[in-house]
Design a protein with these regions (language model features):
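Substrate-binding surface in catalytic domains of secreted glycosidases
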Residues: 136-140, 217-221, 226-343
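Glycan-recognition patch characteristic of GH18 chitinases/ENGases
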Residues: 93-188
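Conserved, mostly hydrophobic/aromatic
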Residues: 127, 207, 271, 312, ...
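Glycan-binding loop/region signatures in secreted carbohydrate-active enzymes
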Residues: 162-176, 316-384, 414-422
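Primarily a LysM-type cell-wall glycan-binding module
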Residues: 1-19, 41-67
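Active-site groove signature of glycoside hydrolases
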Residues: 128, 190-219, 270-284
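Short, acidic/polar
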Residues: 107-122, 183-198, 253-262, 376-389
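Acidic/aromatic/glycine-rich contiguous surface patches that form carbohydrate-binding/processing clefts
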Residues: 384-422
């Protein structure tokens, strides 16, 4: 796939003519409802392969990584003498490596859940069904997962049970504390978890406990050790969601201390680095997954954990903030495609922030309110996929498949093949 950023004056027809493809091919790959496009929009176009220049890149370094000569790389990109981070270059097609693709799917309705499983199973090693939630007293709220589980039949993908401390509106540290600090409640939780595994078709377990206080470090580790023992007896892999820690962070800080990479990796098959939400929907607007933060969180994880155990969390969503930000307000969460459609509808050019290497734009709604949206697009996604390859990580963990991001699957297939656990 080639990446093309729409310029002022471009039309879908002019882009198709320049790239030597049919308009329909571009429209299908990008799920365009019409031929309308907007400046700054990144499109995927069939044929060839693109590379997005990363901070620290040199022609010699990129050429060496991809088995090219500097002359070949330069001749393929004659119009780019001095690339800057975020610039798009062309590469010859390469042999694709295999990675784990541990996607997440937030359950909505039985019919839609089944459709999503069937749609994404062909490109996913596993799909984690979100979620087996939690009551306020720390016990499991079973998921309405029957339709989704049935849809896995005759697919190559593995259904993963996601156990979280989501209590319906937020992740609850208090609910988690009730369970982890009581031997009785913890064993009750584990018994329920194992009963779900024994009764249903799940073949993997994901622990997504978020906002864990540092005071629960030891209790959480004991819980994971016990769970790991039970799962090993059943030959079921364990994945643990981890808050991102950069090289500049204090890993012993209250909000990070319980995410002990070095200790937890001894009991997990994979750790998922949730390398996003540096700007939360409950905070001020800004880039959700800035490139340098993502890279630094990978480097920290690699200082604690073997690379073959690390999965990079990726996002498929946008935050839509009202500005100026007011404490207590919460940004809307929409899919990438929905964000792009707003830009097209409002005819607002999409900006690409060269510092965070992510897209954003602002617009005024019918009520006169100013919105600021930050999100991922095909260009910023390609940068994250290149990091997976650069650091030789085990794979990726996209959040989440219900959100619309039509370029995601073509980009994934262009870079990697998903490995099979079956």
């Amino acid at each position: 796939m080639r990446l093309v950023v729409v310029q002022n004056g471009d039309t879908l027809s002019s882009i198709a003519k320049k790239m030597g493809v049919d308009v329909e091919e571009i429209a299908v790959q990008n799920a365009l409802p019409s031929e309308k496009v907007v400046a700054g929009q990144t499109l995927v176009v069939p044929g060839g392969r693109s590379y997005v220049w990363m901070p620290g890149d040199t022609f010699s370094g990129v050429a060496e990584r991809y088995g090219l000569t500097v002359e070949t790389l330069r001749s393929s990109n004659k119009g780019i003498a001095n690339p800057q981070p975020g610039d798009i270059l062309e590469l010859p097609s390469q042999q694709k490596g295999g990675v784990v693709v541990a996607g997440f799917l937030e359950l909505t309705t039985p019919d839609q859940d089944a459709k999503n499983v069937k749609k994404f199973a062909p490109v996913s090693t596993s799909i984690g069904l979100f979620s087996q939630g939690m009551t306020s007293n720390g016990q499991i709220v079973p998921a309405n997962d029957a339709s989704a589980l049935q849809a896995f039949e005759q697919t190559r993908s593995v259904p993963a049970a996601v156990f979280s401390n989501w209590i319906g509106e937020q992740f609850s540290a208090d609910a988690l504390r009730v369970m982890l600090q009581s031997d009785t409640e913890q064993q009750k939780y584990l018994n329920t978890l194992l009963d779900i595994l024994d009764r249903k078709a799940y073949k993997a377990v994901i622990i997504d406990f978020e906002m864990i206080p540092g005071s629960l470090h030891t209790s959480f580790l004991i819980f994971i050790e016990q769970l790991s023992g039970y799962l090993q007896q059943r030959n079921i892999p364990l994945l643990i969601c981890m808050m991102p820690i950069t090289l500049n962070d204090n890993p012993n800080a209250s909000g990070l201390a319980s995410y002990d990479y070095s200790a937890l990796q001894a009991y997990a098959d994979y750790l998922i680095v949730m390398a996003y939400n540096w700007h939360w929907g409950t905070g001020r607007p800004g880039p959700i997954a800035p490139f340098m933060n993502v890279a630094s969180s990978i480097e920290y994880a690699l200082s604690q954990v073997p690379r073959q155990q690390l999965l990079l969390g990726l996002i498929r969503y946008a935050y839509d903030w009202l500005v100026p930000f007011q404490t207590g307000e919460v940004a809307g969460v929409i899919g990438v495609q929905d964000a792009v459609q707003i830009a097209i509808r409002e005819n607002i050019p999409i900006q690409f922030d060269r510092r965070s290497l992510t897209p954003w734009f602002a617009y005024q709604d019918k009520k006169g309110r100013i919105h600021e949206l930050w999100f991922e697009d095909a260009r910023s996604l390609q940068l994250k996929l290149q990091l997976v390859e650069y650091f030789s990580l085990a794979g990726i963990a996209p959040w989440q498949y219900e959100q619309r991001f039509p370029q995601f699957v073509p980009m994934l297939q262009d870079n990697f093949q998903s490995v099979n656990w079956l």
